[in-house]
Amino acid sequence: MKTVIFLIVSSLLLIGVKTDNGYLLDKYTGCKVWCVINNESCNSECKIRGGYYGYCYFWKLACFCQGARKSELWNYNTNKCNGKL
């Protein structure tokens, strides 16, 4: 029984390490996925990409996703957007 509990806890820790929070990446343009006030669209897109909750961050006009894989998130250091939409 202790082994089963240990395996479950270990799995949860590994899953937590491989996920992150951030702005969704539009892989075609390299930009953030933009939005205005549509939380439903951002939430759906976030869940499709493996996250558990997404919303439209109004001040940045971009979809913010919690729990998605890092490869699905926009990163400032690897930004390839250059203003193209």
UniProtKB/Swiss-Prot annotation:
PROSITE patterns listed in its UniProt record: LCN_CSAB
Q: What is this protein called?
A: Beta-toxin BmKAS
LCN-type CS-alpha/beta domain sequence ranges: 20-82
What does the entry's domain section say? Has the structural arrangement of an alpha-helix connected to antiparallel beta-sheets by disulfide bonds (CS-alpha/beta).
Q: What would be one Pfam family of this protein?
A: Toxin_3
Disulfide bonding pattern of the chain: C31-C81, C35-C56, C42-C63, C46-C65
What Gene Ontology terms describe what this protein does at the molecular function level?
Answer: sodium channel inhibitor activity; toxin activity
Per the similarity annotation, which family is this?
Belongs to the long (4 C-C) scorpion toxin superfamily. Sodium channel inhibitor family.
Keyword annotations for this protein, in alphabetical order, are: Disulfide bond, Ion channel impairing toxin, Neurotoxin, Secreted, Signal, Toxin, Voltage-gated sodium channel impairing toxin
InterPro entries in UniProt? LCN-type_CS_alpha_beta_dom, Scorpion_toxin-like, Scorpion_toxin-like_sf, Scorpion_toxinL, Scorpion_toxinL/defensin
Where does the record locate the signal sequence feature?
1-19
Taxonomic source organism: Olivierus martensii
